[in-house]
Amino acid sequence: MNRRSFAALLPALAASLPALAESQASPGSGANKKLIETGVYPGFTPPGQFSGRAGHSFFHGMLPTEIGCEAHVSYLAVGAQHEPEEKHTHSEIWLVREGKVELRLNGESHMLGAGDVGIAVAGTMHWVRNAGDTVASYFVLEVGTGPIGH
């Protein structure tokens, strides 16, 4: 293949890159491009007995402005950690509903109680665990440019 033939293929190659990137995304990434619609989303009551964590996603997708958004409520059993310490390309905001949680942000621990809010902007190492002696629950709002994946 000479340079002229190769150059003729470049537009087709460039056009195929977005599809290739999407096909290479891990199947369990959870990225969701579904359009979020205006509305009311029903709540969730956790089972009477659970170990670790329980939760409910209210919505997960894209706002009309191309902003990825996901909202859920999580319930943590005493001592339970939500997930391993990690960072994301999106931001996460927590609003504690009940109980006491420890929110670690870039290695610094913060104790939050009912009504407290914490935020980890994109790129912040973080994790949450139940630091109290009763079930803890909190709402999470995740926002970022592009789809939110898990």
Q: Where does each model-flagged region fall?
A:
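A short, N-terminal "cap"/entry segment at the start of jelly-roll beta-barrel domains
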Residues: 2-68, 83, 150
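Histidine-centered metal-chelating micro-motifs
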Residues: 81-83, 87, 102, 118, ...
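Short acidic-glycine-tyrosine-enriched beta hairpin
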Residues: 108-122
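A generic "binding-loop/recognition-motif" signal
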Residues: 80, 89-90, 108, 124, ...
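Ligand-binding loop in jelly-roll beta-barrel domains
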Residues: 122-148
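Short, conserved beta-strand element in jelly-roll/cupin
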Residues: 75-76, 87-102
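Aromatic/pi-system hotspot detector in well-structured domains
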Residues: 69-72, 117
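Conserved short histidine dyad/triad with adjacent acidic residue
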Residues: 57, 72-88
